Design a protein with these regions (language model features):
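Aromatic-rich carbohydrate-recognition surfaces in CAZymes
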Residues: 170-179
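Beta-sandwich/jelly-roll carbohydrate-recognition scaffolds of carbohydrate-active enzymes
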Residues: 1-171
Length: 179
């Protein structure tokens, strides 16, 4: 759904790799910092100019902007496995920080985390391999929980399709490791 008055697109996908309940949804919200000058939906193999909502399977949204050459349009994106409202709540986590501020905060966290181990070796290739492997090992498990409107930790259960209290983690990172 395109919401022009809020420079926003909301929706969900049911795409998954199997083994999840029927109510599985990955809800998303995208908010842009410029108004739309063009909007359309895509569905049934056609582009419907001016329409703001599509409900069939395999649909999409198209938006356009009036920009000057080189002007950047920023998009703020959040998702939730719980609800569209929760996706909106998750978007608030970004606050008013810019893309560059968020990227720098991420770099600082990774530098601090990777810097906990010091490797002494003059071979740049070995250092690069070690820190690349350390980085990948720290990507997992992934957090699969969210904070609700009351600040409580909740998660969508891929086992029964319910929203339950507490933490949940997923993806060990070793699913494609063979012995």
């Amino acid at each position: 759904k395109i919401i022009p008055e809020e420079n926003k697109i909301i929706g969900y996908t049911t795409r998954n790799s199997g083994g999840v309940p029927q109510n599985f949804r990955n809800y998303f919200v995208v908010v842009f910092d410029k108004p739309f000058t063009y909007k359309a939906t895509v569905g049934d193999d056609e582009i419907r100019k001016g329409e703001t909502e599509a409900k069939e399977n395999h649909t999409g949204a198209i938006v356009g902007f009036s920009t000057r050459k080189g002007e950047i349009v920023h998009a703020r994106v959040a998702s939730s496995f719980i609800s569209p409202e929760q996706a909106e709540l998750n978007l608030k986590e970004l606050g008013d920080r810019s893309f560059d501020e968020i990227a720098e905060a991420g770099r600082q966290v990774w530098n601090e985390t990777l810097g906990r181990i010091a490797v002494e070796d003059d071979d740049v290739d070995k250092l690069r391999t070690f820190y690349s492997c350390l980085y990948r090992s720290l990507l997992f498990p992934r957090s699969f929980y969210e904070l609700d409107a009351n600040g409580k930790v909740v998660h969508y259960s891929p086992y029964n399709g319910e929203v339950l209290p507490g933490y949940m983690f997923t993806d060990t990172g070793f699913w494609d490791t063979f012995l």
